[in-house]
Amino acid sequence: MKKVFMLVVAGLCVIATLAALKGEDEGMGFNEVSALDYCDAQVRRTLVSLADSAGGMDYTMMPRNILKDESQWNLRKTTRDEWCSGFWPGVLWYDYEYTGDESIRQEAERFTESLKYLSQSPIYDHDLGFLIMTSFGNAYRLTGKEEYKQVILSAADSLATLFRPNVGTLLSWPRNIEMFGGHNTIMDNMINLEMLYWAAKHGGNPYLADMATTHAEKTMKWHFRDDFSSYHVAVYDTLTGEFLRGVTHQGYADNSLWARGQAWAIYGYTMVYRETRDSRFLDFAQKVTDVYLERLPDDYVPYWDFDDPSIPDAPKDASAACVVASALLELQSYLPSDVARKYRSAAIKMLTSLSSEKYACGESKPAFLMHSVGHKPAGSEIDASIIYADYYFIEALIRLKNLL
């Protein structure tokens, strides 16, 4: 009965916040507070749905996706090869940051704690940065607890073992060296450099920051075409470090522009500039942003790959829009007012579309957003609600709220 009551309350909150957002869409202007209220209501719906009949919860099971024709989260066990496990704790930490609700903080702590063992396990791949910084990174940022700091430092040391000095980048997928025919570095890996920079600033080996910068430099040199669009995967000779080729894994083709890959580039180089204050990275962040913005459809939410020949019938990828919106709200803070205004306006247009009835789940699902694409070539998570879309959506809203 209690679970049913909580679902009813959460549902009423969703209705109220969606009504507010709809009014804003019709002329009142985007309001990040209404969007955050909506996220909070959806978080509470998810928490209710995760509880068993006795009110208990398995904190090792994380929301991953809600497929197109489904209405509830599919859960995944927290394991070292489940790269999305940190995003749900991260969503809870951002919701706690917004609401100040101690019950949300307690749930965030419990889900975060279930990931601790990953910092002490043999490294699986580059995704350890996603797993730890979204969960423990936000936990430490909001609480300052020493135990969280130690987990991040340990994980950073583990991630650093993937760095290959002869190549100059981290090896993204050790298990796929043979498949790609060499040392593989994927664009997603740019996000994981943040953990190396963080550790270097918080008592870890200063060389971790040098390692991250070297990776960013090598990626900047070889991972992009002349127009600053990115390959998904850069393949290097394992022995000599020579760049061999750029290919795709999750995009449409080797020479196409996979939307989320470019989103990782925008977010990653913005972060690298924050950590280094090296103007080369600020300039490059703008270049990779501009090629993305120039190719967006009218609603500012990209198709999953900008070069899919089935456009406009190709699926959209809301997750890419969320990553970019969050990145742009940081990037604009480093730029002169005229350029900053351009990027800030683009981010708000993205968030406005994402908050509309076209993309927001509303009462139909407890996720924030619909219409993301995970891995289309593999037929996986196409036109789905995906947890990392929700993570970067709420992060972008928090950044906008703190900006205004």
Regions flagged by a language model, labelled:
Residues 1-27:
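Bacterial Sec-dependent N-terminal signal peptides
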Residues 22-404:
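Glycan-recognition and catalytic cores of secretory/periplasmic carbohydrate-active enzymes
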